[in-house]
Regions:
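Conserved mid-core segment of classical short-chain dehydrogenase/reductases
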Residues: 86, 91, 112-129, 172-175
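Catalytic loop of short-chain dehydrogenase/reductase
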Residues: 151-202, 214
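Rossmann-fold scaffold of SDR-type NAD(P)-dependent oxidoreductases
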Residues: 30, 104-112, 135, 160, ...
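Catalytic Tyr-X3-Lys loop
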Residues: 121-140, 159, 183
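C-terminal helical subdomain
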Residues: 7, 12, 201-211, 217-218, ...
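Amphipathic alpha-helical dimer-interface segment in Rossmann-like NAD(P)H-dependent oxidoreductases
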Residues: 95, 99, 133-154, 191-192, ...
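Conserved glycine-rich Rossmann-like NAD(P)H-binding loop of the short-chain dehydrogenase/reductase
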Residues: 49-63
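Canonical Rossmann dinucleotide-binding motif of NAD(H)/NADP(H)-dependent dehydrogenases/reductases
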Residues: 15-52
Length: 264
């Protein structure tokens, strides 16, 4: 990242780019290098936000940041390689953002991963070990690192992407569904923190959960041209829903599951 004074000026200038609640908002995106992350960077930049992406893959992060900058020439979009499995590193990242841009108005959690099995009997607990890190530990670290800064914001939002399977797990998805359910529970606890921090007043910050069946993007369609991907959410539609969380009052989305697919 660059000089903090310059970046705070860029954050103020970003207010002129969009027309909605994200004008000038400073939003961090965890898992910014994947297809969903790329779509989120594009949509948030389009809305006039200052976007700070993080990923563990420097090359794909740089490509995602460059794509968002190219699409929206006046946008401030930066990226940083961060180890979200290390709490201190995650806290340092949150602190750098607030110091350089003056505040943090959002964290979008897009760190993903999937492991499944043919049957419940064939469940491999090594899958759980991996998913616990990707889907739970990164949520724990980002919430603990960012919650106070988000509470200080007048429009703080933490957005988790979850799966319908967390509410209705299938036999072959035991590890994945359990991990998603745990991530949801952790996020809902953060939502209760925001509610209580309001001391009886309407909250200005919120933790919300966007629920999908699964995600689809153009590369998947190209690889499987005959697949219907029924019920899947396109990453661009997900990005639109992410941006929409800021358009609603905090009290309306705090602690809520917002369904982008059919509710079980």
């Amino acid at each position: 990242m660059s000089d903090g004074t310059d970046n705070q000026a860029q954050a103020r200038e970003a207010r002129t780019m969009g027309n909605g609640a994200l004008n000038g908002a400073v939003v961090a995106v965890a898992g910014a290098g994947g297809p969903a992350g790329r779509a989120a960077l594009l949509r948030l930049a389009e809305a006039g936000a200052v976007v700070v992406g993080a990923d563990n893959d420097p090359q794909r992060l740089a490509e995602a940041v460059d794509a968002a900058r190219y699409a929206h020439g006046g946008a401030t979009v930066v990226g940083e390689t961060v180890d979200l499995l290390d709490l201190d590193s995650t806290r340092d990242w949150a602190g750098r953002i607030e110091k350089e841009f003056g505040r943090v108005d959002g964290l979008v959690h897009l760190v993903g991963g999937w492991r499944g099995s043919e049957t419940f009997t064939k469940t491999n607990l090594d899958d759980w070990d991996l998913l616990e890190l990707l889907l739970i530990r990164t949520v724990q670290h980002t919430t603990l690192a960012f919650h106070e800064a988000l509470q200080r914001s007048d429009r703080g939002r933490y957005v988790l992407i979850s799966a319908a399977g967390a509410s209705r797990p299938t036999a072959g998805n035991a590890a994945y569904s359990a991990a998603k359910a745990a991530a949801e529970a952790w996020t809902l606890a953060m939502a209760d923190y925001f509610r209580k921090a309001g001391a009886g007043q309407e909250p200005t910050s919120a933790a919300a959960i966007l629920v999908v069946k699964a995600l689809v993007h153009d590369a998947m369609r190209a690889e499987r041209p005959n697949a219907k991907f029924a019920g899947f959410t396109d990453v661009r539609d997900l990005a639109e829903a992410v941006a929409g969380v800021w358009e609603k009052p905090a009290a309306e989305v705090n602690g809520k599951r917002l369904w982008l697919t059919e509710k079980p």
